[in-house]
Amino acid sequence: MKRIVFCDFDGTITVKETFVAVLKHFAPQLSAQLIPQMYARELTLREGVRRILESIPSSRYPEVLEFTRCETIRPGFTELLDFLEAQKVPLVVISGGLRGMVEVVLGELIPRIHALHAVDIDTSGEYFQVNSEFEGGTELVAKVQVMEKYLVDEKIAIGDSLTDLNMALETPIVFARDRLAQYLEEHQKPYIPWQDFLEVRDYLAKLWNLVSNDE
């Protein structure tokens, strides 16, 4: 059976909501206005995030990357990668945030990621210009569109917030925490609660019958 794991980045791989912190830090007034509207689903992520990003001067891009450099990765992520590699199951990172931020935080783990899909930024003008290969619907990175690229028998999603909702609704096996868990409860969509990636690894090991029932 061919399997694949799709994993969000901000607030999922990272302990904190890295991208939201960047928006609030580099565009505080617009973020204070638009982020609550996005969480309340009164404004789409596609429109709100674009407006905030394109208000940030291009000259500040190095500061954005430096701001995220020391973000903490959630415990167990490396162990999950070890487990998935042993099972020959690829992990794909799908982030609604900036590609550069993801690459800075993951660092030496990047070669172990099967693929990374995120928002690209053009800094050749005065302000950020957003480019996204998978922009569509309500999202700058339409995660369901990304998932459709991968033809496998079993898809697993891991996430934590609003940017993961559409992905979670379209995936049979979902690990959800924080805001995503709340949204899924509203939609009456079953999910597996989790706090760290060791829990994800151990659940998948049991699901795939890789450990005995009495362990």
Regions found by a protein language model. Give the residues of each.
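Long, low-complexity, intrinsically disordered polar/charged segments
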Residues: 1-5, 9, 53-64, 158-175
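Short, surface-exposed acidic
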Residues: 30-36, 61-64, 112-113
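C-terminal cap/substrate-recognition subdomain and adjoining C-terminal extension
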Residues: 76-90, 97-215
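Residue-level marker of alpha-helix boundaries and capping positions
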Residues: 25, 70-71, 93, 171
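Short, contiguous strand/loop micro-motifs
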Residues: 21, 66-68, 133-134
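Metal-dependent phosphoesterase signature
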Residues: 46-82, 87
